[in-house]
Amino acid sequence: MFIDKLIESIKAKKSPVVVGLDPRIEKTPQFIKDVAFKRKGENIEGISEALYLFNKGIIDAVYDIVPAVKIQVAFYEAYGIEGFKAFFKTAEYAKSLGLMVIADVKRGDIQEVAKMYSKAYLQNQLFDAITVNPYMGEDTIMPYVEDAIKYNKGIFALVKTSNKGSKDIQDIKTTKGEYVYQSVARMINRISNSAIGKYGYSSIGAVVGATYPEEAKVLRKEMPNCFFLVPGYGAQGGTVEDIMDCFDENGFGAIINSSRSVIYAYQTPYWKDVYSEYEYAQAARAEVILMTGMINNGLVKRKYIAC
């Protein structure tokens, strides 16, 4: 079962950190672009090759210290077919090194369309889990739930997202007197009961932003069986203190994603005087180690058992 495998990988790596592979060509080190453009030309093919080579370096640097990577499809989809090739090659390479792969695709559409999206990702051996958007209703996410159970995959449904504008819809109060995100949370928690693993968590999880710690505290109680995928740490402003209530009393229950703060760590004030662009991957590894240590120390301070 997906969730059991994820928890076991977190235990083995002693880290709940997920590295987000959201590469931007304008921030890719020049030496990587030079190699890629020489191979493929200074065109869409060359750009896509550069993104893949950049990702490959990050994966090589972190595969032994994190349980999973999250690949945001938009950063590849922007370059058409060649970008998709880089997306799939990245997933394939990560899998070859034993990493779990989360495809961050945030799919949400009517049921018949959802079946095709599910076929594309959850029936693909390269991906262990995907993100989905449940805000069109329960019927629109059931194809993903059914395939997750059938193929031992996972889904993370958007519940309370990390962006500032999430309040525009998610924080509206319903006629029942609760926030929209709470209604969605209860729906996802109920559905999650159909895919509980041996550690008490479900393969049907939730996306809960690090930038809303008070809401996360409420949602941890509302969704006791759901593992949280937590974006918003680092570059978006989420801190160690903000994410503590995403975890349960045993130090599990959440994976914390960091994208820009890790993959471009060599450009940050903390690391820029230590690592050059040629050492971007080493800087990413150093940032993951630092982040993992801070999270685990935070869990210890909260009298939790560290991962």
Swiss-Prot record:
Entries under CDD domains matching the protein: OMP_decarboxylase_like (cd04725)
Family matches, as SMART domains: OMPdecase
EC class of the enzyme, as a word = lyase
Pfam families for this protein: OMPdecase
Q: Name one GO molecular function term.
A: orotidine-5'-phosphate decarboxylase activity
Active-site annotation: K106 (proton donor)
Tell me which Gene Ontology terms the entry assigns under biological process.
Answer: 'de novo' pyrimidine nucleobase biosynthetic process; 'de novo' UMP biosynthetic process
Say if the entry is tagged with keyword Thylakoid: no
Lyase: is it a keyword of this entry? yes
Metabolic or biological pathway: Pyrimidine metabolism; UMP biosynthesis via de novo pathway; UMP from orotate: step 2/2
The EC number(s) attached to this protein equal 4.1.1.23
Catalyzed reactions: orotidine 5'-phosphate + H(+) = UMP + CO2
* Assigned keywords, A-Z: Decarboxylase, Lyase, Pyrimidine biosynthesis
The entry assigns this protein to a family as follows: Belongs to the OMP decarboxylase family. Type 2 subfamily.
Q: What is this protein called?
A: Orotidine 5'-phosphate decarboxylase
